[in-house]
């Protein structure tokens, strides 16, 4: 299973909603894929972020995992270099309208 598949599965396992994967490789030289997903509350958002980190660790992912946002954040960004994941509490996703 590749990194993208691991991330998508980790989001689904924690009931992430409206998961959309974008190929942004033609738009930016820094990222190949952007994933946007929603959760119903802060607790679920954090559970998704934690599950992504744990599943990557279990798969022996050796790349850097950078995260912006903490347990009180309604938007968590996980930067895996070639993949960037945006996790939003549902209402916040509509405010920023990335997709």
Task: Give residue spans per PLM region.
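Short hydrophobic/aromatic beta-strand micro-patches
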Residues: 36-39
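Polybasic/polar functional segments that serve as interface/processing modules
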Residues: 1-30, 42-75, 90-92
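C-terminal structural segments of small proteins and small subunits
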Residues: 76-99
């Amino acid at each position: 299973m590749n990194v993208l598949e691991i991330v998508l599965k980790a989001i689904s396992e924690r009931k992430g909603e409206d998961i959309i994967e974008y190929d942004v490789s033609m738009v930016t030289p820094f990222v190949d894929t952007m994933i946007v997903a929603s959760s119903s509350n802060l607790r679920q958002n954090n559970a998704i972020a934690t599950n992504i980190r744990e599943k990557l660790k279990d798969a022996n992912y050796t790349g850097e995992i950078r995260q912006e946002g903490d347990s009180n954040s309604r938007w968590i960004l996980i930067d895996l270099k070639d993949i960037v994941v945006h996790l939003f509490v549902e209402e916040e996703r509509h405010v920023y309208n990335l997709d």
